[in-house]
Amino acid sequence: MPEEVHHGEEEVETFAFQAEIAQLISLIINTFYSNEEIFLQELISNASDALDKIRYESLTDPSKLDSGKELKIDIIPNPQERTLALVDTGIGMTKADLINNLRTIAKSGTKACMEALQAEKLVVITKHNDDEQYAWESSAGGSFTVHADHGEPIGRGTKVILHLKEDQTEYLEERRVKEVVKKHSQFIGYPITLYLEKEQDKEISDDEAEEEKGEKEEEDKDDEEKPKIKDVGSDEEDDSKEYGEFYKSLTSDWEDHLAVKHFSVEGQLEFRALLFSPRRAPFDLFENKKKKNNIKLYVRRVFIMDSCDELIPEYLNFIHGVVDSEDLPLNISREMLQQSKILKYVSHMKETQKSTYYITGESKEQVANSAFVERVRKQGFEVVYMTEPIDEYCVQQLKEFDGKSLVSVTKEGLELPEDEEEKKKMEESKEKFENLCKLMKEILDKKVEKVTISNRLVSSPCCIVTSTYGWTANMEQIMKAQALRDNSTMGYMMAKKHLEINPDHPIMETLRQKAEADKNDKAVKDLVVLLFETALLSSGFSLEDPQTHSNHIYHMIKLGLGTDEDEVAAEEPSDAVPDEIPPLEGDEDASRMEEVD
């Protein structure tokens, strides 16, 4: 329960931080933040978030801005009182918001609890359209106070005042504040104004008793000259000049850039990128100790890092530019990228799993129901589903991740963890089905390279796999759709298909028994061909002659229905077209005609 303290007519309520906050508050800055200047970035970022909220609300209710039309951020250092204030005209907070949000770090809209670690005392003054103006104060101890504020009205928004420690007064200097703002918050979508208090000597007449010094308050509006990240597809006439100015401000180069690439990408992650190629190669291009790239990463226009190795290959380290995203996952300090769900596979791997398994296909439903994933999923291993065409090209170059090799479950040589009993059973199956495999290879001949016992099937009788370096079924379909494909390459990349049979399936066991009884039985041959063609379809391949497969299906249906083919044989019509077409009249004369030039 809060304690109420009455000072005249003003009521002050004291609240205790939640227990975990009181214990952890002294550790947060060292644990979450690698750079102490990040506190100012956090303040500006949260001010920007508050401005976004009021702007969104004003789209449906313009009266929300009656308490202040201008959306801006002000930074006011005061060296005399050793305070740094940041004021925004955002949505503000109600009394309940102050108590609930600033009491728990996980819910903190302004992260003010963290900023307190950089200050001896923290004061938050806020005004919401639906409530009175309140003040929140804390000395980073175990409690904070909330009371109605009757001081200078702020209209709407939030004013955060940090009473800085003696060793942090550098953040009251104009140079230092500008440096931090330009580095971390250069592309915030709202104007940032820095208020400075400077002393100037003023000339006075000789008859005045003492010399006076006047103080003049000036404001330095950094936002007027700071470059903006433009939207892709803007007016091209102004692009060249603006790109040139942006490049020079980004790189401090005195020459214009050689080339520029401005693009956006939408998909699982969305981002915009603006890349520049300089006119001259940097003098340290081939030095090993230099930065691997010169790409700055922003998330929601807030600077994150300038040394993200994954953004661009090392051999393109001369490229300058910025990348801005709305949805890249960050850690709590917004200082670095956080591993996304795409990369969580390795952390879920079992101890016995030596490889990362994946399957490519046209849709999630197709690959999830594929015969190739039956055994892998039964053993409790996760399979990465890759359903984009570009994935096929990527996995051809990406051979491993985090020390784990990438293995396609649709190719030969799939190795799964086995105990001694399973190994013994597999050897027995190979010996038992050896004759059937040889017979199936003889029947299929050049259609397959070999027929083997499968260790990947559970409920399916057979499947078609490709060689380790050949194309998968999905890649084969992609290449067939290419108008400018290389037919010579397709010839040897598509040729090697392996038929794997499931020794535990009743179809294969019955087929083995029929083959041992009479390997020349026509029904055995028909069944083998039908199984092969069906396996082609279920494995994602296309049939060269669909009509032949249809005829095999119809034939099996007739056998199942007990229909005699002789009874349904169609009679030849009397006016049927003769097999041999008679020669045309005058054909002999035509053959004697000579070609005349």
UniProtKB/Swiss-Prot annotation:
UniProt-recorded name of the protein: Putative heat shock protein HSP 90-beta-3
Which residues are involved in binding ATP?
46, 88, 107, 334
Which organism is this protein's natural source?
Homo sapiens (Human)
Any one GO CC term of this protein is:
plasma membrane
Residue segments, region Disordered = 201-241, 564-597
Q: Principal localization?
A: cytoplasm
Q: What does this protein do?
A: Putative molecular chaperone that may promote the maturation, structural maintenance and proper regulation of specific target proteins.
The protein's matches in CDD domains, at most eight in alphabetical order, are given as: HATPase_Hsp90-like
| Gene Ontology BP, a term | protein folding
